[in-house]
Regions:
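Membrane-embedded transmembrane helical bundles of large multi-pass transporters/channels
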Residues: 1-63, 126, 171, 175-445, ...
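Short, conserved active-site loops that position catalytic residues or coordinate cofactors/metal ions
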Residues: 59-60, 93-94, 98
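A short, structure-level motif marking secondary-structure boundaries and short turns
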Residues: 64-65, 101-102, 399-400, 449
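Structured non-transmembrane domains adjacent to transmembrane bundles in polytopic membrane proteins
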Residues: 72-93, 102-210, 442-640, 770
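Short coil/turn segments at secondary-structure boundaries
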Residues: 95, 428-431, 479
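Short secondary-structure capping/turn micro-motifs that flank functional sites
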Residues: 99, 434-435, 511-512
Length: 771
């Protein structure tokens, strides 16, 4: 039995008997194990070969239509479903806006713009990778038998612009062809090309839902190539700096790429069969999560493997010990992230629900690859570490000792500094982080307009600006009200007086709502009519959202409404999305905290240590959010943020940020069992400092790569998570957590004090601390 000192730590000394379970394989067992390792590698090559092409096809199963993200119970969704009874053509309109260079349109310009509408259906469209030839008419909604749908030219009142609403068929332009692409972007390009030819000295823009979705698709087109290239290149560079080896960085990176192939293949199959919702944001986050997590897990395993190679000659024994030592912290880390991501299933937004399983699949793939493929590849031998090949160290100071070099390394110095000043360090750190938290209320996360979605100039936003300048702000995006025919006049009267509504709301007739519909009877379907009201402000503006809320309040208050009046439209979709995001924030965050706390208690077998890590991580998250608010408002000059930004940042920072504290405290618990609560934590920090810092830098770099996609949401997530991970790595895990744990002593590990296991007693041999 090992002897214990007065503080409960195991005293130096060699374990009574060495366990023989880790002996190097020989003879028949060696052959079987070699075959098994080769089999693992072959299986992963097959996975990479099958899953790799699926990564490039993920864009073909994306859905970036905001309405599809909302729950079926949202009023705007119910209104949209009801409106299909009045027009089942399934339009995805494109707004073609012609405008002059500042003066009134000349007769020649008006004639050219009018000719554009007449020849529009015959304009050629080159679609697909094979350049198949079609026409715009192939993608218009179907008109009455023998007749085409009219596409009129609508001049502006100021005479400086004209609007053409092109009724594209949503089913036709979004249908995925054999090459995995839809035709929307090509059709919009055809509309723009023909418009440029007909501008007659003016300018043309393509806006509306079709133009916006096409521009979103173009922005996310960089995910498959540019984002992966930037992320993988940055990670490879960091791995070279960390390992200073020729082959090892490629081994770790290949593991990450294989994990991505596995995750991409699974997500593609599930999205293709409508099991989950995938959008451009989820795809980008999937790539970053897999590359970052798989590399982090690989760093931890390789670090422990290298440590064991300084203790034993056999690479099999070294990888077996390293695998066993890393299994628990990596499993806890992956489990924490997966649980946090799956909490998104509680969201009422389908886009958030989709990200939950998408991200969980990515983390699970990273976990499996890091603990199967990477160990098999590492069995190639010590030469992978060339030119810094680890050698077995001399015995110094007993079986559990850690050797120190003549010149202490950086993390040895930091650990000594922390153990000498624990209370002062954690108090000062908490105060500094609390000051940063004070700026959280300044984060403007109440939503942004669609014109603020892009970080670069895009044509659909320029078109929306031109539309707002020359036409009523909500032109082309009316508020849609579905009401019983009997109370329709009362609803019209109630809505007409609302601030933010332009003109008199119109009841839809069989001839439409324009001048041609004057005197026509209303179109009645199942006892209901459709009313359209034009907003005076841009449909995606805060003023328009306020007007929609007022319309809902007024329409629902009409006698006889009784829940039968529905208010929808594009602006209503934005309102419902914002409201649902705020609700998700209040529901999901507490659930994530409780789930993470339970995982930590089970892992560390200590309520106090688990509470310490959760509290430190929440404080770190608040600090990151506060600093981000300052940067967004005063440096980057962002217009605001989506309500989902704080939620996603919380999920990633709490689930991923706590990883480093998990890695630290699991090793600290092992050391505390031998050296007590002070020296044990100090040694845990010294041994893990280099690898955890490298892992933090890798994860921060991969998330920062999201900024190459010119979308406001992704840029904000990139900054918050990258900064938060670095803050957690260099401040929380380095100073706050170890200082507080040392200051509380054995109480940190209440109620179950750490005790060494038989494997730990048998395996502890000296290892040099440092990179």
């Amino acid at each position: 039995m090992p002897k214990h000192g007065r503080d409960g730590a195991t005293e130096p000394g060699v374990a009574g008997r060495a366990l023989d379970q880790d002996r190097a394989p020989s003879g028949r067992n060696a052959v079987l194990r070699a075959v098994g390792l080769v089999g693992v590698v072959v299986v992963w090559f097959v996975i990479a070969g099958l899953g790799g092409p699926a990564i490039g096809s993920l864009s073909s199963v994306q859905s970036n239509d905001q309405e599809t993200f909302l729950p079926a119970g949202a009023e705007s969704v119910a209104a949209s479903e009801a409106a299909r009874a009045f027009d089942d053509s399934g339009q995805l309109p494109a707004f073609v806006i012609f405008e002059t260079d500042g003066g009134t349109a000349s007769p020649d310009q008006l004639a050219a713009w009018g000719a554009y509408t007449e020849s529009l259906a015959a304009q050629p469209v080159l679609t697909g990778r094979d350049g198949s030839l079609g026409t715009v008419g192939d993608y218009l909604v179907d008109g009455p038998p023998g007749r085409s749908v009219p596409v009129p030219l609508i001049p502006s009142e100021d005479g400086q612009a004209a609007l053409v609403i092109v009724p594209l068929s949503e089913d036709k332009v979004t249908a995925v062809a054999a090459d995995g692409q839809d035709a929307l972007g090509d059709v919009v390009d055809a509309l723009r090309t023909a418009g440029d030819a007909a501008a007659a000295g003016g300018s043309v823009h393509i806006a509306g839902p079709a133009g916006l979705i096409a521009d979103l698709g173009a922005a996310f087109a960089g995910i498959d190539g540019l984002l992966l290239l930037v992320a993988l290149s940055a990670v490879l560079l960091i791995l070279f700096l960390v390992y200073r080896a020729v082959a090892l960085p490629f081994v770790v990176l290949f593991t990450s790429i294989s994990a991505l192939a596995m995750a991409g293949g699974i997500v593609y199959l599930l999205a293709k069969n409508d099991v989950l919702t995938l959008n451009g944001q989820s795809q980008g986050i999937l790539f970053i999560l897999v590359v970052g997590a798989a590399t982090d897990y690989g760093l931890l395993l390789v670090s422990r493997y290298r440590e064991e190679l300084t203790r034993v000659e056999s690479t099999w024994t070294a990888i077996t010990r390293a695998w066993r030592a890393c299994l628990e912290p990596i499993a806890a880390s992956a489990g924490t992230v997966i649980i946090g991501l799956l909490c998104l299933l509680l969201s009422d937004l389908n886009s958030n629900k989709g990200l939950g399983p998408v991200g969980a699949i990515g983390i699970a793939s990273s976990f499996v690859a890091a603990l199967t493929l990477l160990p098999a590849l590492l069995m190639a031998g010590r030469w992978l570490f060339w030119p810094r090949i680890p050698r077995v160290a001399e015995h110094l100071g007993g079986a559990h000792a850690i050797t120190h070099r003549a010149r202490p390394g950086l993390w040895e110095k930091i650990s000594v500094f922390v153990v000498r000043n624990p209370r002062k360090i954690w108090v000062v750190t908490v105060i500094a982080l609390a000051v940063a938290c004070a700026f959280v209320p300044t984060l403007k996360a109440s939503g942004t307009s669609q014109t603020d979605v892009f970080l670069t100039d895009v044509d659909s936003i320029a078109g929306q600006d031109a539309l707002s300048e020359h036409f009523p702000g909500g032109s082309g995006n009316p508020v849609v009200i579905i009401a019983p025919e009997a109370i329709a006049p009362d609803v019209v009267a109630a809505v007409a007086g609302i601030d933010g509504i332009s003109g008199e709301p119109a009841v839809v007739t069989a001839a439409g709502t324009g001048p041609q519909a004057a005197g026509a009877p209303p179109l009645v379907v199942d006892g209901r009519v459709q009313i359209q009201a034009t907003l005076s402000a841009a449909a995606d503006s805060e003023g328009a959202e306020d007007a929609v809320r007022a319309v809902r309040a007024a329409a629902h208050a009409v006698p006889g409404a009784d829940g039968r009046v529905l208010v929808g439209g594009n602006t209503a979709v934005l309102v419902d999305t914002t409201d649902t995001s705020v609700r998700d924030l209040k529901v999901i965050i507490p659930v994530v905290l409780v789930a993470v706390l339970i995982v930590l208690i089970l892992l560390l077998r200590s309520l106090i240590a688990a509470l310490l890590l959760v509290a430190a991580t929440v404080l770190s998250f608040g600090s990151a959010l506060g600093v981000s608010a300052l940067m967004f408002n005063h440096v980057f000059d962002f217009p605001g943020a989506d309500p989902a930004v704080p939620l996603f940042a919380f999920i990633f920072l709490v689930a991923l940020g706590i990883d480093y504290s998990i890695f630290l405290m699991t090793r600290a618990r092992e050391e505390v069992a031998f050296h007590g609560p002070h020296d044990g934590v100090m040694r845990g920090l010294a041994v893990t400092g280099g690898v955890i810092t490298s892992a933090g830098i890798v994860l921060a770099t991969t998330f920062a790569a999201l900024a190459v996609i010119p979308i406001l949401f992704l840029a904000q997530i990139a900054f918050i998570v990258a900064f938060g991970v670095l803050l957690d790595t260099f401040v929380v895990r380095t100073l706050l957590v170890p200082a507080a744990a040392i200051d509380m002593g054995w109480f940190t590990w209440w109620p179950i004090r750490p005790r060494p296991t038989k494997h730990q007693l048998a395996q502890r041999r000296p290892v040099s601390v440092g990179p």
